[in-house]
A protein has these predicted regions:
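Conserved PLP cofactor-binding pocket of PLP-dependent enzymes
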Residues: 172-193
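A broad structural signal for alpha-helix termini and local helix breaks/kinks
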Residues: 126-127, 174, 243
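Hydrophobic, well-ordered secondary-structure elements that form the walls
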Residues: 170-171, 193, 219, 240
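Flexible, small-/acidic-enriched active-site or ligand-binding loops
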Residues: 203-243
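Short, glycine-/Ser/Thr-/acidic-enriched flexible segments
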Residues: 116-117, 186, 217, 224
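Residues at or immediately preceding the N-termini of alpha-helices
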Residues: 163-164, 184, 236-237
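Residues at the C-termini of beta-strands that transition into short coil/loop
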Residues: 61, 182, 220
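Acidic, glycine-rich segments within the central catalytic cores of soluble metabolic enzymes
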Residues: 2-168, 197-207
Length: 243
């Protein structure tokens, strides 16, 4: 309901098709983050002026204030942003080719091409430098208008490669912003996340281990303190003995 009224579901999905629901409980998470910021600002103001204040938080208002350039497109450019799958909306001044998600041999890879230099490197990578000076592709808008054909060319280049092979070659050799799309099992095992210790493995006993997320930051003097709630009846005897 909050995503509907806040204007987000209208933007999510394929062009010409029904809106799609976002996974998880995004309004709850986002409102909690904004509430944390509001509380810290209020505490800072209390320390500065000695005056407290009453805070109001709304999931709906949180979503409505997160639209950024979507609102600018509507009110300044007169362009109503709409569902456009994994690409920029062509009617927008932000339109460009290269922000797209394409299939490869073992899943999907996301490209974030947005500048002229990146476009030229993409053309060189797929062996189509002739496109750089082609009048049909010499502006961002023209490339966006021909995105289906360009998707076909890039897909031919990546089709037989794995996500990791594409990620390494595009980022390390060509300096292009790309990323493999990972599922949660892959995220939990990711070497970078494990090195940064943002996940916590909790032993449940009986050889059962569950992984929890911790915090998206690392503080030099703080470590997450995560534990389990008591099991059923775990403290019953101690409680009755003292009461």
């Amino acid at each position: 309901v909050q995503l509907d009224l806040g204007g987000y579901l209208y933007l999510t999905g394929e062009r010409g098709k029904e809106p799609l629901k976002l996974p998880g409980s995004q309004p709850d998470y986002l409102t909690g983050l904004k509430a944390s910021a509001a509380i810290h600002i209020a505490l800072w103001e209390r320390d500065r002026s000695g005056s407290g204040q009453f805070l109001e938080m709304s999931m709906l208002e949180t979503l409505a204030t997160l639209h950024q350039f979507t609102m600018e497109m509507t009110t300044f450019e007169g362009v109503l942003r709409m569902r456009n799958g994994n690409q920029w909306q062509r009617e927008s001044s932000f339109a460009s080719y290269g922000i797209t998600t394409l299939p490869c041999s073992d899943g999907y890879i996301c490209f974030g091409i947005s500048t002229e230099d990146q476009w030229e490197r993409l053309c060189a990578m797929i062996g189509r430098t002739d496109l750089i000076d082609d009048p049909d592709y010499d502006t961002r808008i023209k490339r966006a208008d021909n995105s289906e054909y360009l998707d076909t060319l890039v897909t031919e280049w990546i089709a037989d490669r794995t996500r990791q092979e594409i990620f390494v070659e595009t980022s390390e050799i060509w300096g292009l912003p790309t990323a493999p799309i990972l599922d949660m099992a892959e995220v939990v095992k990711d070497d970078q996340f494990r090195y940064r210790e943002i996940f916590y493995d909790q032993d449940l006993g009986d050889s059962q281990v569950v992984t929890f997320p911790t915090y998206p930051y690392i503080a030099s003097k703080m470590k997450p303190n995560i534990g389990l709630p008591p099991s059923l009846g775990e403290h019953t005897e101690d409680f009755l003995a003292t009461n």
